[in-house]
Amino acid sequence: ESLSKLIGIPWKVHGRDYNGVDCGGLVILASRVLYGLTVPDMWEYGAENNLQVAREAVNDLSLFSDPIEGVEDGAIAVMKFKDVFHYGLVVKGKILTISGEKQKSLMRRIPTHYKVTFYRIRKEAE
């Protein structure tokens, strides 16, 4: 039931609740709702600095998570294609994600056409 409530949430820049989320907000919300884990909000970006903030967020992941090999439910998925970083959360072997304006959150297969790195959230990060 919790997962079904997370699917179909509309896109909203800086959104952090069921009324709307961006990719970072979806990771924060879904981590808490599905796994009881707290993810710090490191995605304070705007149109003019998205790339810079996304790069910094990748570095900040080490503050509360560890890179892992392979797929694990509850892990943050960092997808990189060209110079763009995108975030999602692994749920039931797929990625819960939202892509951008006019989109809604959905489950996707783990992509194979660009680099994906997975991070396990440390319990003490809470």
Go through each PLM region and give its residues:
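...with weaker cross-activation on analogous glycine-rich loops/strands in unrelated enzymes
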Residues: 42-111
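N-terminal capping segments
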Residues: 1-63, 82-85, 122-125
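Residues in well-ordered beta-strands of folded domains
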Residues: 12, 78, 96, 119-120
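A broad, low-specificity signal marking well-ordered, structured residues that form hydrophobic/aromatic
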Residues: 9, 93, 116
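Short, Lys/Arg-rich amphipathic alpha-helical interaction segments
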Residues: 104-126
